[in-house]
Design a protein with these regions (language model features):
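Substrate-binding/catalytic cleft of secreted carbohydrate-active enzymes
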Residues: 1-182
Length: 182
């Protein structure tokens, strides 16, 4: 994750207003620790985040705000996390699902493919809820259920040769996840 340009950068680049400080930066660093967004882009992000929280504030099934996914657009993480905690203290905060972890919020979240994993021996995570936010990605091209049977199908770890092997791989991931819970 994280190799896609943030929405503001794509739109601004398309409008020809964007001039990168270092034209080779994005080629050499597709996953910044904390992207350097200009103030106007950050303000737009915050306006949209506030609007989302305002619209969804009374939905009881929402228990966690997740501000970033896999570093996509992740910027000013501590500032944003502290703002969310103050603006809606009634919910947990996951600053970055599978992205760069910052010591703010309530959740430390890992994405691992194909099988789940969490580095339980890292003291920095001790005070946080540990979550495997994504795992699996096991692929099986079920005939009659493909968008385009002519295109290549995929799955993390490659495609198994049989449906039985696919099911076994899926069960193995679930068993590993169960052991992490213990």
């Amino acid at each position: 994750g994280g190799s896609e340009w943030p929405k503001w950068k794509r739109l601004n680049f398309a409008s020809k207003n964007y001039v990168p400080k270092n034209k080779n930066w994005w080629k050499d660093h597709s996953d910044p620790v904390n992207a350097d967004w200009p103030d106007w882009a950050h303000e737009q992000y915050m306006a949209e985040l506030k609007s989302m929280i305002d619209v969804l504030h009374n939905h009881p099934s929402l228990i966690v705000w997740t501000t970033f996914n896999e570093r996509w657009g992740q910027h000013r993480s501590l500032e944003i996390g502290q703002w969310v905690e103050q603006y809606d203290p009634s919910r947990l905060l996951n600053i970055a699902s599978g992205g760069n972890f910052f010591e703010v919020g309530d959740v430390a979240d890992q994405h691992k493919y194909p099988h789940p994993y969490f580095p339980l021996d890292m003291p920095i995570d001790d005070d946080y809820i540990k979550v495997v936010g994504e795992f699996g990605g096991h692929g099986w091209p079920e005939q009659g259920h493909l968008w385009d049977p002519e295109k290549r199908n995929w799955g993390y770890g490659g495609l198994p040769k049989t449906k039985v092997a696919y099911i076994e791989r899926y069960k193995e991931s679930c068993e590993i996840l169960g052991k992490l819970k213990k």
